[in-house]
Amino acid sequence: MRKILALIMAALLSIVALGGCMNKGATPFDGTKGETENANDLVPTKYETVNDLEGVTMTVKGGTVSPNGLTLTIENNSDINCLYGQFFLLEKKLDDKWYEVPVTIEGDYGFEDIGYELAPGDKQEWETDWQWLYGSLDKGRYRIIKDILDFRGTGDFDTHYLAAEFTID
């Protein structure tokens, strides 16, 4: 049984690693300190459907938001097993539309290859510092997006996306 669980975890970690790799960085985000915002220069969201995994929620823990990071609470009130990793993406709301916050580093980057199990009834906190990737965020309305797997077995899972909104004052 332990060997099967180890194989399942190895397969999921590989999937998370491949999904967490991103292409080359973009220019610094219009709207970071000292720059102006222009939605024409930004990439619109790819995540039109979020928070569609019934019984699984992600919220921002009160009092943890800063221009450099925050803490999320991820809760599984369903009867399914879930897995999530280190991957996240930030978006900013401009003119009632969501746009990706471009990364501030050049070249390729990735996220730690790890999978966190979120069993039915579990509630976990996940802390992140995005300064290495996005820099310090300017004032505005943002959301953080994380992928989460509805995991049934090796090769048998569905990927969903959770989003939690927050404001930098």
Per-region residue spans from a language model:
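Positively charged n-region of N-terminal signal peptides that target proteins for export
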Residues: 1-4
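Sec-dependent N-terminal signal peptides
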Residues: 6-13
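C-terminal motif of bacterial Sec signal peptides marking the signal peptidase cleavage site
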Residues: 16-20
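Primarily secretory-pathway and cell-envelope proteins
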Residues: 22-105, 119, 147-169
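Short, solvent-exposed, Trp/other aromatic-anchored flexible loops in extracytoplasmic proteins
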Residues: 105-143, 147-152
